[in-house]
């Protein structure tokens, strides 16, 4: 998503670009080198925090902020209603990733997972996975949703797939599935 947003800045608004042009190739190489230059990365924001991000987890027992929870539910339900999944229903909506743990940074995003039994959608679960991946890619590209300055990224996960995470929060049930524990040796 971030690379997509930087495209116009690098290549301009011209939609009549010849993909074989030397200018395009040269600009693209420059673009990639800027995006992947290790010296240009500020690592100072990658640090351990003694507490969770208080913009999100400011309630007793580190519960999710009620306004943020409501926004995440609206986002997930809006996405879900845009899909063609028949009578299939999701099992849970979860918040995971670095913002649900102690290793968040200014580069974090809100990882919003919708858990579904893919076989409830269709017996061809590989096709279901491809469909969900395509739809979430389009959705994430078309919707520039920020919460507290962090980009919201939707992902549809099969309930039968294992999910490794330091922190995993059920937005639907408003409770921790796996509350993160600060252990600096994990990083």
Q: What do the PLM-derived regions correspond to, one by one?
A:
Residues 4-13, 19-22, 26-34:
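Proteolytic processing junctions in secreted/extracellular precursors
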Residues 37-108, 115-187:
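Catalytic core of pol beta-like nucleotidyltransferases
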